[in-house]
Structure formats: C-alpha cells, structure tokens
A protein has these predicted regions:
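Active-site pocket scaffolds in enzymes
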Residues: 193-205, 211-212, 216-242
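Active-site microenvironments in enzyme catalytic cores
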Residues: 1-185, 193-197
Length: 242
C-alpha cells in the first residue's frame, strides 16, 4: 500500500516470497556446509535460473542464549534483560549472497540463509563475562533519542562487552598444503551499536514470549576498516575487491 509503482517487486512472480528464522538448521561448528541451490539472476540474464550458489559467504556474529523467558503479552524491561540472558556463543550466519540478492525484496533473506547456521559448541555464561562488561558504545552526536524501551542508565553504563572476534580462513587447499589458518578479519563487539540486552528487550517489547534456550544473533560484527569487516561481502565490496 505504501508503494505506488511498481505494485509488485520483480521476484514476486518467480518465487513465494517469505522470511523466517529457522532453528532446525542451526548446527555445531565443524559440521560440513553443503552449497545451497536457489533462484539466481546472473548479470545480463532476463530472469532467474535455479542453480548452486556461487557467492557463499560467512557472517561473524555473537549468539545470545535466553536463560529466563517471559510470559506471552508481557515485555522484558531493559533493566531486567541482563538477569534473563544466560550466555553467549560464536555464531556464523552462512549466507548465499547471489540467492539473497534476488529473493530478499521486500521481506528480507529466506532460502539464502535458512540452509545453515553454525554455533560454537561452548556457551560462555554472563557470569564469566562480567569482567568484560563496559559502557555501551557511543552512538554518535547525530543519533536520535533512544526509545524508552531501549533506554536504561544501567545498560548505558555497562551494557557493552569488550569481546574481540577473529575470523580465520582455512581452505581445503591450505589444509592439503599444510598451511596455517589465515587471519581474515578482527572485529570488536564493544563497538556494536546495540547491546545484547537491548536486542532482547526489543524482541520482547511487543509481548513476544521468549523461552529458555532461545537463540538470537547480534548481526555481523564489523567495523569501519577493512580489517574489521566480518563478512566477505563487506571485505570485497560486493566482489569488486580481492
């Protein structure tokens, strides 16, 4: 209703557009990733073709596990979020960029991400992370005022986390040649715009009931420099750089 022309996105007549988050394809780190198939529009093509993805990517994220949920209809105040979060893990949100580029309008990625998500086998509890708590990141002078459900003095004081995440690349050829993993990027979660507690409070702000064991991702941990970017899409500027 908000879009006048054209009334439908180009992909509407080619696939049933959808968006979801899927728990069944969350796997422990080390499980093999099979290249997904999907609809892809190649440069110069008149329409999509169904074929294997060529632009398989990773996204380095922090995963957060809910410890204590909330009843349906009752939001989680931001001031309580740190008492409800159990712990954090590493999360790789595998992404097929060429599938994603075609399917994501207007609802976001669907088959380009649902094929697999990897998480570390260990969960670091919030108690263990207590020494690494710090002030939330500076949102900048031009940042709008925080919505009331995302604004709490305690979160601003120590909602941030001084956690560094490294991405190493070890290809099949590198293994065969006996080479060590190569550091691809290093991200700093302390720079994240939103805290993990704000994410929880926002998720439940409409009364959505979170449950013990629920997992949510932080989004790609990236920074302004190329060395801090947490996915190949950003590092290569959509394939323009090597």
């Amino acid at each position: 209703l908000n879009r006048r022309e054209p009334p439908l996105f180009p992909n509407f007549k080619h696939l049933p557009v959808a968006y979801h988050g899927r728990a069944s394809s969350v796997t422990i780190s080390g499980a093999p990733c099979r290249r997904p198939w999907g609809q892809i529009v190649r440069p110069g093509a008149d329409g999509p073709s169904f074929e294997p993805a060529r632009m398989l990517d990773y996204e380095m994220e922090i995963g957060a596990y809910v410890g204590v949920g909330n009843p349906m209809g009752y939001p989680i105040p931001l001031a309580e979020a740190d008492q409800r979060l159990f712990g954090l893990c590493l999360l790789n949100d595998w992404s097929a960029r060429d599938i994603q580029g075609w399917e994501m309008a207007p609802l976001g990625p669907f088959l380009s991400k649902s094929f697999m998500t990897s998480v570390s086998p260990w969960v670091v509890t919030m108690e263990a992370l207590a020494p690494f708590r710090m002030a939330a990141a500076n949102r900048g002078a031009d940042a709008p005022a925080l919505s009331p459900h995302l604004n709490d003095p305690t979160d601003r004081l120590d909602g941030g986390l001084d956690v560094t995440v490294d991405v190493y690349l070890l290809s099949e050829r590198m293994r065969a040649d006996g080479l060590d993993p190569a550091l691809r990027s290093r991200g700093y979660f302390r720079k994240n715009y939103w805290t993990v507690f704000q994410m929880m409070a926002h998720h439940a702000s409409n009364g959505c009931n979170l449950q013990t064991g629920d997992l949510y991702g932080s989004g790609t941990v990236s920074g302004p420099s190329r060395e801090e970017m947490g996915c190949l899409l950003e590092i290569t500027d959509r394939g323009a750089l090597t």
